[in-house]
A protein has these predicted regions:
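Predominantly extracellular beta-rich ligand-binding scaffolds that present long acidic/polar faces
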Residues: 1-229
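Cellulosome-associated attachment modules in secreted, modular CAZymes
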Residues: 223-299
């Protein structure tokens, strides 16, 4: 299943941003190969695509695609992704290259191979380059990483990979080579102009500046047009306020995750200097369209 196409074969998908929420329930068979743009990307490429929808399935689940044998370039995920195994912000499993991609959506698994960008990079031709993850990655299984869950070949190229330092305990869950690494960055480092330069290493002009962290250059004309003053709990570069922010705030209030200082400012939607159930209730109403603005505590 996919937000745009279920099975892409010998085709190219470009310039597509999906905002479709997907829940696939297992009835008689596997509820697998699910993506925000394409369920499976076979001998096909995805370029300059994005996902803002929430996705829940069993395995091979990704913000862009669940499974790929083609390249993925210049893509991002801002949606919350949940599943069992092979769950990631960009692709569940790939045998080819993933380049210049980033993730800001929370990733939650219950099994093995879970990551912010690529859950499983399979084979010598798989590569992950110039990518970063800024969201929590959690699973009770093994091979869990902020950027890559697992590589199974020492020749798979991993370079210029970064993640926000508190989002996961390790950048790559299991690597076949000491050269396959990802580097932790602080929030201040990710928000800096220097980090934009770092992300553009070897591919000048691919990333541009946004309010919180590097965004892809094809996005920069849109960034800021939808930015509200409050509610952007996941610090999405576009400034979207949606179900992903509701879920992060819910997790914070029940003690499942921590929020950093800037996220707490965004979560305090009624500006009473306290993040609590009242903020969550208002955020839910805003996302549902019941209210069109956040009231101040003084109103």
């Amino acid at each position: 299943s996919g937000g745009v196409v279920a099975y892409a074969n010998y085709t190219n998908i470009s310039g597509v941003v999906s905002d479709v929420d997907i829940t696939v329930t297992r009835v008689n068979g596997n509820w697998s190969s699910v993506g925000g743009v394409a369920g499976r990307l076979v001998n096909s490429n995805a370029t300059n695509c994005g996902n803002e929808g929430t996705i829940h399935a069993y395995q091979y689940v990704g913000g862009i695609t669940g499974y790929a044998t083609g390249t993925i370039t210049g893509c991002y995920n801002g949606g919350a992704i949940t599943g069992n195994g092979y769950v990631a912000g960009i692709v569940g499993q790939t045998t080819k290259g993933v380049t210049a991609c980033y993730n800001t959506g929370s990733i939650t698994g219950a099994g093995n191979y879970v990551a912010g960008i690529v859950a499983f990079a399979s084979g010598a031709s798989a590569s992950v380059k110039n990518c970063y993850n800024r969201a929590y990655v959690e699973s009770t299984g093994s091979n869990v990483g902020a950027v890559v869950g697992m590589t199974n070949n020492a020749s798979a190229a991993m370079s210029n990979l970064y993640y926000l330092d508190f989002t996961c305990s390790q950048g790559i869950g299991s690597a076949k080579s000491t050269a396959q690494t990802a580097t932790a960055k602080t929030r201040a480092e990710m928000d800096s102009a220097d980090f934009v330069t770092t992300m553009n290493t070897g591919m000048a002009g691919t990333f541009g500046s946004s309010r919180y962290s590097p965004a892809l250059s094809w996005q920069t004309d849109l960034i800021g047009l939808t930015t509200p003053t409050k509610g952007n709990v996941n610090l999405d570069p576009f400034g979207y306020v949606d179900e992903n922010d509701v879920e992060l705030l819910r997790q914070y209030l029940v003690g499942e995750i921590e929020l950093n200082d800037e996220q707490l400012v965004q979560a305090d939607v009624n500006t009473d200097l306290d993040v609590n159930q009242s903020d969550l209730d208002l955020l839910i109403q805003y996302v549902a369209g019941t209210i069109t603005a956040f009231p101040s505590v003084d109103e």
